UniProtKB/Swiss-Prot annotation:
Interacts with BCCIP and PABPC1; the interaction has no effect on TENT5C poly(A) polymerase function. Interacts with PLK4; this interaction leads to the TENT5C recruitment into the centrosome. It holds the Pfam family NTP_transf_7. Belongs to the TENT family. The keyword Cell membrane does not apply. Keywords: Cytoplasm, Cytoskeleton, Nucleotidyltransferase, Nucleus, RNA-binding, Transferase. It catalyses: RNA(n) + ATP = RNA(n)-3'-adenine ribonucleotide + diphosphate. The lineage of its organism: Eukaryota, Metazoa, Chordata, Craniata, Vertebrata. It is found in: Nucleus; Cytoplasm; Cytoplasm, Cytoskeleton, Microtubule organizing center, Centrosome. This is Terminal nucleotidyltransferase 5C. It comes from Rattus norvegicus. SMART domains: DUF1693.
Amino acid sequence: MADEGSSTKDSESFSVLNWDQVSRLHEVLTEVVPIHGRGNFPTLEITLKDIVQTVRSRLEEAGIKVQDVRLNGSAAGHVLVKDNGLGCKDLDLIFHVALPTEAEFQLVRDVVLCSLLNFLPEGVNKLKISPVTLKEAYVQKLVKVCTDTDRWSLISLSNKNGRNVELKFVDSIRRQFEFSVDSFQIILDSLLFFYDCSSNPVSEHFHPTVVGESMYGDFEEAFDHLQNRLIATKNPEEIRGGGLLKYSNLLVRDFRPADQEEIKTLERYMCSRFFIDFPDILEQQRKLETYLQNHFADEERSKYDYLMILRRVVNESTVCLMGHERRQTLNLISLLALRVLAEQNIIPSATNVTCYYQPAPYVSDGNFNNYYIAHPPVTYSQPYPTWLPCN
């Protein structure tokens, strides 16, 4: 009986795609995506179909068996529900492979870099281009994770419009999603086999069976959340620090919590994890700036709204910080928001804007002087210490 229950539970996480969904998947896989080179390196014109087939065949030639290949992230969500509010920015591909030693990690990296040679324009002397050169020219991000629960690597190919092609090679990973709406993976093997073996084009009456999986566990429930723009998750304590940024991104796109009572607990978990993973203010700034660049490349108008939502969540749900640390992060978010407005010429200059923040509790003390008068800097001819003793 236990086996039957487990089998039923597993089957709930899978669903067969209909023709409209297969058609959108075909469009995503065959769309030409530019990979922009740094410096004088030419732009590579690739399709996901071609890069997957090239990398997969080269991996298997090198002795690394690919268990399956999947489309992940917002691209998978776009295939399932076209106008879902998330768009189709990320082009994430997952290759399930065995990575028992460092040698396999290195081999995977070399295979991907050498595969890029296939996409260089005609006339380029490929013999003089090394894998290291290709990495410097076309790779936006290179990640390797080796822990007791996670063994995977990521190679992100650069696109100036934020549509990076991300190739993820996974041996094991503890958690593959943050919220139900980003938990979908579409297994590509049947369609890739069709491309290789069929002389007929994909059509409504002649296409392979394609299966999707929700890592959330219940495909229909997650699909309903995606259709109706609902925010839900499982085991929120496992969500990494970036979950707070993704949650705020969902809110700015008019997603709403599926359960209003649980959302405050979820927000507190995410705020705590964000400050655990990014304890330093400079780390927080880098993370926020990178997130804005990657997820709002063509949505300048949404950046300010996003930062204000993030600020509200941090202000209301942060319980793990000293007061000054919390205020420091809130001020960082406010300054980033002002910079966004200045870049959009909505205000003339961020330096001419006064920031107001909620006073600390000790301001209510009658002996506390709540006025600080800023004087213009004075130039001294002799060296003068930059610190003053505290009274």
